[in-house]
Amino acid sequence: MTTSPFTRRAVLATSAVLASSAALAACGGDSGGADTAEKIENPDENINPEGLPIVEEPVTITLMSRRAATSAEDWNQVSAAKEAQARTNIEVDWGLVAEEAAEERRNLLLTSGDYPEAFYRTGVPGGDLAKYGEQGVFVALNDLIDQYMPNLTARLEESPALRTGLTFPDGNIYSLPGIYDPETLGLRYQTKLWARQDWLEAAGMSAPETLEEYRAYLEEAKNAEDGAIPLGGSGIGGIFSCLYGTFGIANQGTDAGAAVDLDPESQKVRYYPASDGYREMLEFLHGLYADGLIQQDIYSSDFAAFTAAGTEGLLGSCANQAPAGYFGEVGKSYVPLKPLVRSAGDEPAWHAVRSELSSIGNFVMTDNCEHPVELARWMDFWYGEEGAKLFFLGVEGESYEEVDGRAELLPEVAEAASIDEGLRQHALFLGGWYPGWATGDWFRGVETSEQSTEGAKVVEPYALKEVWPAFTFTAEESQQITTLGNDITKYAEEAVAAFVTGERSLDEWDDHLATFEQIGLQDYVAAYQTAHERRS
């Protein structure tokens, strides 16, 4: 870094003037908030405003971080973290907390007031972002992004919908995003519907394209092997997703934060599990279940049982990213299906589309932050190509190498028992819930495997072109939505399971809709309509 102290002071002072008003508004009335605002207004001369290292003399930042079981026990021993420290001069006290205890720990820290400089990968809910943002506990990041985060700014400029999804009704951004590259199809179209090619051939069938043809295939699959499961899963949600386009629901994608889309007639927000299309989907699925064509314990089965059945070659059809990623060699025999249509001649439609804004709430800066500018610059490092490669791949030469312009994992990593096992001591992304920029150039997972990508190419021509990111609300709105949403979701899950399994007849649909209204569905939808209008 060659910037002189004089140049560094001049640049930082100019940036501070532009940042001061929002920083003061963002921070609460306690001394911690005032100190953080002061540090944003008057950055330390130790900070380099651009380039690396971020600081001339090392600085330590303190976080609370959720640690998934799939990640390393000590992140400072991960190659990517060690290399990032060497390049940035930022040392990190990660404050690792096991994922099962992370939510409780975060809430206790916020209640006590004795919280760290930032919460990292803890999944702060939108309601808490609004609540603590409005209180000044969470720092508004708008001007820090504009002045000190050029990599993230570039991502936001490439896709304005990202900024829209991050911004709260008060105009502030309180968290940093997880971003999916829209050109990486396996990330945008994750769950696909699959059928066994060898079973299709044995039955003399081509890949089904209509609901009737799909049912006929499942009937053949039922007798393909002893113990065969025509259509299975670890839960039924993935199967639902693959049928949304067929039945004209979820027409704004699957990342809105709730089961809402636009009513095709009124063009207003609707709760689509209360729509006619959803009822028709349940009717189709109940018919499959009643005839033994859907795994009979699908509502109680877990992921381990699902993968075991797939590995044993018992599944005729499933909905996931890529069967080969879970079932081993037998998984390679599955082929992706085009979006099913109700009748021959109907136009296929694919609505299981993820937003580019894959998550919010996984990085928030608090008003106890002693190093706000340093922390903003450190986070921005991960949104550039240099940092993103470290985050997802590790250090070149240790875990991957460049081959014909593409990063390829080294054999000892690629041939490990799993991608998680191979990259655990090299990369930081394991366990998900990360603020960062995922693209097919450096993200290595089942979503970007060859089979997943081929499946995504099959559905992509029929996919929604624009989808909603999650909505943001005021603290007051969030409290209402959370209360109503918990009751609505709990009832909906129980009722849907009963309709599919036949414990409850779909003849009771009108009573079902009446129950939704009694719970408060009208107010729930109205809140989403307000949020939709606010950002339209």
What is the role of each PLM region?
Residues 2-7, 12-536:
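Extracytoplasmic/secretory soluble proteins
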